[in-house]
Amino acid sequence: KSAELDKPQEWRDKDGRLPENLPKIASDGKTRYLGPLHSGDEPFMLAKNLDGVAVLVDKNRIKSGIFAIEHLGCDTLLLDDGMQYLKLAHELDIVLVDCGAPFGTGAMLPRGTLREPRSSLARASYIILTKCGGKPQDELISAITKYNPVADIIVSDHGPRYLENVFTGERLPLKALRGKWVACLSGIARPESFENSLRSLGAHVEICRRFPDHHWFEQTELQEFYDRCADRAMDMIVTTEKDAVRLEKPEEKPEVPIYFLRIEVEIYQ
């Protein structure tokens, strides 16, 4: 979190120069300074959604952490993918486990998807099970407690909340998807989960355009996709919130309106 400083410090020195190797400051908790192109799509989305929270980007987490404390008044540092960042001492380790593929293929990178062996769960203070679909997870919890019998285990699910127009901010209720012919646009790791969410909400998903995770969309490929959707008489294009921040506003209003699906996390155990 970002606390008010008694004596706010300027980032520049007396000669107006920035400190050397300044971290990327997506937000200082009050003002967003970088767009998604320079900060990255996920940091930008965090900065957009988290008022009062500073968001910094840097390979050197120690350097950016010191900057956050000294210049932004932060008293708590939360690292993304921080469990493997052993240069910085941790007071807590929070591990997320996807219920759909809790241990990936069972193998570590590069053969599989695990960054550490399952036994590393023993270091976790909290283990959050994600995308559980409201179903009991006794079997998975039992498997996890073999590695860590003392960590608090939290069961959660990702749930859609509403649709928001990418360029106008107009919001629609989820029922607006029922019976509509929808085209999906995504550049995420597991697009099928997003597409199935739309189907479960009653949409007829007719077109799915998938790009690699974090893909930076070219305007030409987007326009080609928009034209295809118009030719097929789609009612709407739906993308993810993470992808929405990478969509540049076209010069002309698209024939098919473009929305992102707002997803929020709900803890139920």
Identify the residue ranges that each predicted region occupies.
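Short, flexible loop motifs at catalytic/binding sites
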Residues: 72-73, 87-89, 191, 201-205, ...
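Short hydrophobic/aromatic-enriched beta-strand-loop microsegments
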Residues: 77, 95-97, 153-155, 204-210, ...
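Short, flexible loop segments at boundaries between secondary-structure elements
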Residues: 159-161, 212-216, 254-269
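Phosphate-bearing ligand-interacting subdomains
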Residues: 233-252
